[in-house]
Structures are given as C-alpha cells and as structure tokens.
Amino acid sequence: VQPSIALGAVDITVEEMVGAMSTFANQGVYVKPNFIIKIEDKNGVVIDQPMPVTKDVVNKDVAYAVVKLMEGVTQSGTGSRLKWGGAGFRNYDYSFGNPIAGKTGTSQNNSDGWFIGMVPNLAAGIWVGNEDRAAHFKSTHYGQGATTALPIWGIFMKKCYADSDLDVSKEPFERPDDLKIKVDCWTPKKVVDSTAVPTDEP
C-alpha cells in the first residue's frame, strides 16, 4: 500500500473507490464489487448466482464515525448543494432531505473531479476527467468535484429515488449498538500547547 494514496497521488478507478467507500456504509465490511447478480436461462431458471466476496476490515464504531463525518460534507461542506437546491445552479434542484454521506475530490490542476456518495443501501461514485493529464479545467471554480461530478451524482440519485423498484433508502445510517466512539464535531475544544515556555506576559 502506498501511503500517498490518501492524497490522491495514485490512480484509482471508480469501481475501487466506490468499493472502498461503501465499506463505511456496510458497518466496516468490504464487499467486492460484482457486476453480475445472477444468470438465468430463457425460462427464468437461475443458472448461476455468484456469492458476494466480503471481508471485515474496519471496526463498526470507526465506520460509523467516518460516515457521520462524511455526512458533514453534504450538510455544510462542498456537497451541501445536494440539500438546498443546487447552490443557485439552474436545473440542479436536488433538495434531498435524507442523510447522505459523501466526499468531493479534486486533483492537481483540476484534472479530475470526484464525488462518492452513500445512503445506507447504495454507494455510487462519479469521476469527471481525462486519461490525458494535460486536459484539465482552467480554474478550481469549474474543475472541482463539487461542480463537475456532484451534479451528475445528484441527477442519478433523483432517478434512483423516482424508481420505487430500486427501494433506495432515505433512512439514517444504522448506529451500532454499544457505540463507544463519541462523534461530536460541534463542541469547540481548547488546545493546550504542552511545548510552550511559561512567561509573565499576558
């Protein structure tokens, strides 16, 4: 594993990113993405139904804490336009009222724009970019993931919610029983510098 992967220094596919992010929605269980749910013959008889490959990789409490942090992205961060009507952009009136955890992303020189978003039973990701790294937007205003990828995710999710057969959740993420991590992003903390040298000056 390359440590710089967290900074976006390593190329990664949408499949890999969505698979990794969905681990948090799955309470710490990684489910390897699978494109085939089942194979049926012409009479509807199931010939093959691959079993999901799963692995416990993150503690449930940690996964829930990360989900709550990523909910902040859509409540008051770069993904907040999903909640309040598109941030003034025409034709992007999403106004989702349900909890959504997500993360926008923008690479060097605005070459890539990302948005990965999750609800309890669906994780989806959008990448806007070009294999030619020389192709990029001129400014972060236009090239950031919140401007390029997030609107596409919003349109996709509106269509998912419009299709009742998909049964995409609007419920809150499940809180683990016996949660041991206190998730509090609002109470200010007093920072004490233990390396400071005491003086008489105020």
Identify the meaning behind each predicted range.
Residues 11-201:
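A penicillin-recognizing enzyme superfamily signal
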